[in-house]
């Protein structure tokens, strides 16, 4: 199967800023919201291209959007695909401004 090349910024949408992702950054793992149709190889190549680091592992997870109540009835939050990226030892990505 041939991977379709997409621009890196179309694959990596934004970093996840939370207490859990901040704690994982101490272990060299960084969490990003990615395009729903992106695969692990594309995510790895995009991170290496954008941040100039060596990626050793990529874990992905799909988060279903929650049902929310609105004034007029019920709605849904957007589904998200997240990637937890592990970088090589001694390298880091500065997404928290440290």
Curated annotation (Swiss-Prot):
UniProtKB keywords: Ribonucleoprotein, Ribosomal protein, RNA-binding, rRNA-binding
GO biological process: translation
Example of a GO MF term: structural constituent of ribosome
Any GO CC annotation of this UniProt entry: ribosome
Pfam family membership, one: Ribosomal_L23
Keyword rRNA-binding carried by entry: yes
Coiled coil start-end: none
NCBIfam families documented for this protein: PRK05738.1-3, PRK05738.2-4, PRK05738.2-5
Protein family membership: Belongs to the universal ribosomal protein uL23 family.
Known partners and oligomeric status: Part of the 50S ribosomal subunit. Contacts protein L29, and trigger factor when it is bound to the ribosome.
Main function: One of the early assembly proteins it binds 23S rRNA. One of the proteins that surrounds the polypeptide exit tunnel on the outside of the ribosome. Forms the main docking site for trigger factor binding to the ribosome.
Protein name: Large ribosomal subunit protein uL23
Organism name: Bifidobacterium animalis subsp. lactis (strain AD011)
